[in-house]
């Protein structure tokens, strides 16, 4: 049976003394498997804190390499890893932070052919992608695999976050946005820009929600959309109800598999 070692008890002592965590909770974190879709702006801070928290297995999925323009916000990487696959750069960083965890690196883009095999190996999925088509693909795959999804996005000075778990009766991503917007209608981060530290804020919130889900503590945001405005320093929570006409999780679904045209419009 998996137990905490003496060094682990010392490493996670500030967790263990928390009434809502304790030794049993830390064991839950050790046994947990979390998949990060994207090892970039959101995946970097989320990965760092999940590794430090003692998540036993972390998966990194990204088909991109480290570019100089990434380093303004993607803190899992550095000048020394320019040109390396992001997942390999991230794997080295997370393993250096916590050598007791397992970090799996998948140097590939997610698509309809590989997404189900990836998410099925993990308990919770964090979506840090930078385009709508990937977000819809990840949402749909997690729905069919019955996996909890923590989704975040950012645009210029604003970030959004929600937890998605329709298998527990909550709304899915398509309840909020039934279809992706037309290609080119909404600029991505490469075109519109993004405040570097905003990635840290939203990625850490993703990690926090994932830890809460694993431990079964706190209030879920599965029926809320959290909106953060960095300029005005304001957080808002907007109600996100289930859509009875949702094409995926509604009573009369139109989407029954991953045969749609999920065209990735931007790197993650």
How does the language model describe each region?
Residues 1-268:
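Adenine nucleotide-associated cytosolic modules
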